[in-house]
Amino acid sequence: MKIAVLMGGPSSEREISLKSGSAVAAALSGLGHQVITIDLNREVVARLKNFAPDVVFNALHGKPGEDGSVQGLLEVLGLPYTGSRVLASAITMDKIMTKRVLLQAGIPTPKFLAWTGAEYATGKKEIKAAILKELGLPVVIKAPTQGSTIGTFIVREEGELEPAIAGALKYDLSFMAEAYLAGPEITAAVLGNRKPQVLPLIEIVSHTGFYDYQAKYTPGLSDHIIPPRLPDDVLAAATSLAGRTYALLGCRGFARVDFIVAGGREPQVIEVNSVPGMTATSLVPDAARAAGLDFPDLVQKIVDLALEP
C-alpha cells in the first residue's frame, strides 16, 4: 500500500510531530508498505498528487493539521486519511468548544470561564475579579487551541494571574480559566470508528509536579502506570466517559481523552486530543501495548480504520 505520512508543519508542536511521523513511517515501512514522509508546506498538494497515496497518515500535531484545516484539504483531494474528520477535529482542537459540548451533554468537566483577547484588553480588572470570585485559586489558565500544555499555566497566587493570561494570549486570540482540581491525572486512548474500543487506562505521574511539555517528552520525567491506582468503580466510570466523549464529539480512528480524577473519586474530562503523540514516550502506544497491540500493529490498525467507509 502507498502511504504518505504528513508531519512537521508550522505549529508549536512541530518537533513532536516530526518524531511521531518518523516513528509511524518506520513502522509502516517495516510492514512492507511504500511510504513517504511529507513535511507540511506549500508543496504538500503537489507532492500528494505526484505520489498518489492510497491513504494519508496524519501525524501533524496542532494547527493546521489537527484543527480540521488539513482534513478539509484531504477531503477536497479525495484522499482517505487517518483520524477524525473536519468537524470533530475543529471542535476537539478548541478546548472552549469541547467543554461547551461536554457540558451540554452532561459529561463532567471542570468549571471554566473564557474571554477573547479584545475583551480582556478593555476589561482586565473585571475579568480578573470574575476569575478569582468564580474559580478561586489555584486556577488553570489555558490557550484554548494549543496542545502539549503549551500556553498552559497553573496560577497559585493573584500576582501570577496577569502574566499567565498574557502568556496564553501569545498563542491564541482567546483564553480560558479553568477550575483547578486536585487529584490523579489519567488518560484513555480510544481506538475505532462505529464501535470504538477504550484501551487500558493510564495514570500519569510527573516528576516535575506538572505534566508539562518537558515532562511529556523527556524520558524519565514522568511515569505511565497501568492500571491506574484507583478503585475499580472509578476506572469503570472513566472508561465509560471516554467512550461517550469520543462518540459525542464524532471522533474516528483514534484519539485520547484526558481526565483529572477529582479527589481520587470523580473523573472529569479536561480535554480530547484527536491526533495523539506517537513517539517513544507517548501514551497511546503504551495503552495499545497493554492491550496486546505492539506499535506496528497499532499503526496498521489506524490505517485500516482510515479506509473504513
Swiss-Prot record:
One of its GO terms (molecular function) is ATP binding. It catalyses: 2 D-alanine + ATP = D-alanyl-D-alanine + ADP + phosphate + H(+). Mg(2+) 1 binds at D258, E271. It is found in: Cytoplasm. GO terms for cellular component: cytoplasm. Its EC number is 6.3.2.4. Residues 99-304 form the ATP-grasp domain. Cell wall formation. One of its GO terms (biological process) is regulation of cell shape. This is D-alanine--D-alanine ligase. Mg(2+) 2 binds at E271, N273. ATP binds at residues 132-187. The keyword tRNA-binding does not apply. Belongs to the D-alanine--D-alanine ligase family. Binds 2 magnesium or manganese ions per subunit. InterPro entries: ATP-grasp (IPR011761), ATP_grasp_subdomain_1 (IPR013815), D-Ala_lig_Van_CS (IPR000291), D_ala_D_ala (IPR005905), Dala_Dala_lig_C (IPR011095), Dala_Dala_lig_N (IPR011127), PreATP-grasp_dom_sf (IPR016185). Gene3D superfamilies: 3.40.50.20, ATP-grasp fold, A domain (3.30.1490.20), ATP-grasp fold, B domain (3.30.470.20). Its main location: cytoplasm. Disulfide bonds: none annotated. It is an enzyme of class 6 (ligase). Its cofactor is Mg(2+); Mn(2+). Pathway: Cell wall biogenesis; peptidoglycan biosynthesis. It comes from the Bacteria. The lineage of its organism: Bacteria, Bacillati, Bacillota, Clostridia, Moorellales. Keywords: ATP-binding, Cell shape, Cell wall biogenesis/degradation, Cytoplasm, Ligase, Magnesium, Manganese, Metal-binding, Nucleotide-binding, Peptidoglycan synthesis.
